[in-house]
Amino acid sequence: MISGGVSIIGNYHGVNQDYFISKPYKDGHIIVVSDGIGSKSLSHLGSKYICESVYDVISNYAFDLSVISFKDIIYMCHEEWKKRLVDYDLKECYATLLIVLISENFIKAARLGDGFLTIYADDKVSFLYDKKENYFANETDCLKEVLDRDNIEILEMNYLKFQGALVCTDGIEIGRMQEYDLTNFTKEFVDEYSNKSQEEVITEIESWLVDWPGIDDKTLAFVMEGEN
């Protein structure tokens, strides 16, 4: 497996409000990405602590994840997030959440808020992305004091052949953000980079992501089949 990511601070930002983790756990791999809400002064802490909470809760979970409701797992992550932020004003720590959990024969993914994730398996690309159907462009769902389970979008699948997964914050827009745009981008990314080393992949992503249009923070995390 090749995994990693790149996060670039946006123009005019004092601190990068995005955070990501992409690394192995037990028999699988976790990608978790979060974008701190721009209007919140401590949202960079919110994004950091939810990524760390998700990784720690899932990697230390003692039971079979394949039979547990993923929303229940996210609830546990949310509770851990609140514990880690107990010394801060939680109202200033709101953040989005994107997760891909790749296990030996199943994948679970979740989205709360903007950004997108894609999963390339069995020669098909599946995705979760923010269609902005019920919000203005700068509005989104996010982690707050109470977890809004109804607005968590879940994707679960079994697979035979895993090829890759990408998770991006909303600073990275792909074309017109339609399903064919996400499908083509994912396939091209995996085809281009799956035969390169982690160091080569990260260096090349940095070279073009720094010039990506837009002034927001930009984060892309990935995992692909290939040589580490």
Regions found by a protein language model. Give the residues of each.
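C-terminal catalytic subdomain
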Residues: 16, 84, 148-228
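Generic enzyme active-site microenvironment
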Residues: 33, 112, 168
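Acidic loop->beta-strand submotif enriched in PP2C/PPM serine/threonine phosphatases
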Residues: 14-24, 29, 90-104, 108, ...
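Catalytic core of PPM/PP2C metal-dependent serine/threonine phosphatase domains
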Residues: 50, 63-120, 152-159, 212-215
